[in-house]
Amino acid sequence: MKNNNYGVLLVNLGTPDEASPAAIKRFLSEFLHDKRVVDMTRWLWCPILHGVILPIRSPKVAKLYQSVWMEDGSPLMVYSQRQRQALEKQLNVPVALGMTYGTPSIATGLAELKQQGCNKVLVLPLYPQYSGTTTAAVFDRIAKELKQQPHIPELRFINHYFDHPDYIDALALSVTDFWAENGEPDYLLCSYHGIPKRYADNGDPYPQHCHATTEKLAERLAMPREKMSMSYQSIFGREEWLQPYTEVTIEALAQKGIKRLDVMCPAFSVDCLETLEEIAEQCKETFIKAGGDVFNLIPCLNDNEAHIRMMKNLVTQHSQGW
């Protein structure tokens, strides 16, 4: 019998409902309308978004999604649902899934927990490294939803876990397990989702969190620093983003004589378009063309046992007293 004293809301970014241009357009429109993601003045941004970006990018992105789509849906949704089910089984409390953009929405997740009698909600955004573009966007959505309700639940919000020992251990185990099966590379690159440099200059701690995760992982793996570094991927637009850029770094490593390269994406809690297509396909092609021989993407933590154990411990720690 479940303990319904509190419930857990797992939150990730979201995904299109299907790999069609129309579904991609709906999703990108909601995502790129968020001022946390793109903070340009609306009168300037909206014509660019609706007149240029959505019409051009939606068909292109649809083809990319089609290349990674799984039998049960998008990889992000499939792995997120598996995470929810596994965590609920481990905790024996209600666990709901909500996406910042798309479906199931954060509102749907909160409603599910309410229907199960939860008057206390622990929100776990699955972003290890805090950023205003991701973690804060979750908080905004929750506040907007609860603003409409006369009786709101007691809330606790996990801000980050970039340096949590169980998270670092889970990352390290995923690396050593992968190497046990595939052999060790010449070099390990940690690729994080990028944000505009201006956001960091204005106080977003994301790059500090990414550096700290990389440092702790290197210590945990006992990796010589000349064999490991970090970079930022998924850049779009014309302004400067956090550097070094992943694709530029990968090309440079190959040109320096690195023949076998492994890339992991610690900021992504599940594999998705940005890992399975951008890294595993596009960046692999860049590496091989620049003179590399073997390129591997180390899978994200997804629903592996160490990751679910980390989530369980994180929730248990933050729900003390409930």
Curated annotation (Swiss-Prot):
Q: What is its EC number?
A: 4.98.1.1
The record's annotation in PROSITE patterns points to: FERROCHELATASE
- Which InterPro entries does the entry link to? Ferrochelatase, Ferrochelatase_AS, Ferrochelatase_C, Ferrochelatase_N
Pfam families assigned to the protein according to its UniProt record, in alphabetical order: Ferrochelatase
Chief place where the protein resides:
cytoplasm
Q: Which residues bind Fe cation per the record?
A: 193, 274
> What chemistry does it catalyse, as a reaction equation?
heme b + 2 H(+) = protoporphyrin IX + Fe(2+)
List where in the cell it is found: Cytoplasm
What SUPFAM superfamilies does the record point to?
A: Chelatase (SSF53800)
Would you say which domain of life the source belongs to?
Answer: Bacteria
Which biological process annotations from GO are given for this protein?
Answer: heme biosynthetic process
Family to which this protein belongs = Belongs to the ferrochelatase family.
Q: What is the recorded name of this protein?
A: Ferrochelatase
Species name: Photobacterium profundum (strain SS9)
Q: What is the lineage of its organism?
A: Bacteria, Pseudomonadati, Pseudomonadota, Gammaproteobacteria, Vibrionales
Gene that encodes the chain: hemH
